[in-house]
Structures are given as structure tokens and as C-alpha cells.
A protein has these predicted regions:
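A short, proline-enriched helix->beta-strand linker immediately N-terminal to the Walker B motif
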Residues: 8-12
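Catalytic Walker B motif of ABC-type/P-loop ATPase nucleotide-binding domains
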Residues: 14-17
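Helical segment within the ABC ATPase nucleotide-binding domain
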Residues: 29-41
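H-loop/switch region of ABC-family ATPase nucleotide-binding domains
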Residues: 50-51
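Conserved beta-strand-loop-alpha-helix hinge in the C-terminal portion
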Residues: 70-97
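ABC ATPase nucleotide-binding domains
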Residues: 87-124
Length: 124
């Protein structure tokens, strides 16, 4: 109901804090697909604050990382989560995909993570 009352006003930007917190996978997916549709059909920019790194990888094309009041980077989620110079000071956990890429000797771990996510998006 709350988001519907906001959408009536046709905002240019929606700022959402943990929009999928506490949701099961089905509801999580419904919420995110709904937000994706709003973005694509109405051109609404959606800014999400999240601690769910998989959600960030799956549904966003840009990540802004702030730690201790400082902007650390603006980049793709895959690059953010595979760059130890960003993850460490931002207290972010690198993904298991990154760890697998490192253990398998894949040089471009960022590209590996991005390709996996692209595949996952395609089959969803």
C-alpha cells in the first residue's frame, strides 16, 4: 500500500531501504521484478540500500560504496565484490563466486562473476 501511494505521485527516484528484508525467495523475486518493471516502464530511478550482496549482483547495474562517511567507489556490483581494496575497508564479504574464481585460477574474477550473474538472469 505504501509504495502504491508513492507511485501515484510519479516520482523520478525511489529510495528503498532493504526492500526484500525478511522475505522468502518467491516474495523477494516478486518485489524485485516489480521494481525492475517500474524502472523499465516508467523510467524511475531506484536507489536501494541493501546488505544482500546477491540481490545487488542480480538486480543492479551500479553499486555505490560508502564506508565511514567516504565514497569508496561507483562501479558494477561484480567489480565491487571482487576488488579486495574495496571490500575490506567497506566491510563487505566477497562472494563465493569470487572465491571459486580465485581457487580455479580464473584471472578475471570480475568477468567470471558477471557472466554467471548474466546467465542466472537469463534463466530466471
Amino acid at each position: 500500500v505504501t509504495i502504491a501511494s508513492i507511485l501515484v505521485m510519479k516520482p523520478e527516484i525511489l529510495i528503498l531501504d532493504e526492500p526484500t528484508a525478511g522475505q522468502d525467495y518467491r516474495h523477494y523475486t516478486e518485489i524485485m521484478e516489480f521494481l525492475k518493471t517500474i524502472n523499465e516502464t516508467q523510467g524511475t530511478t531506484i536507489i536501494m540500500i541493501t546488505h544482500d550482496m546477491h540481490l545487488m549482483l542480480e538486480y543492479t547495474n551500479r553499486a555505490i560504496v560508502v564506508a565511514d562517511g567516504q565514497l569508496l567507489t561507483i562501479d558494477t556490483p561484480a567489480k565491487v565484490l571482487t576488488d579486495e581494496t574495496i571490500t575490506a575497508p567497506a566491510y563487505l564479504k566477497q562472494t563465493s563466486l569470487y572465491e571459486m574464481a580465485v581457487k580455479c585460477g580464473i584471472e578475471d574474477s570480475s568477468q567470471f562473476v558477471q557472466r554467471f550473474i548474466n546467465y542466472e538472469r537469463a534463466v530466471r
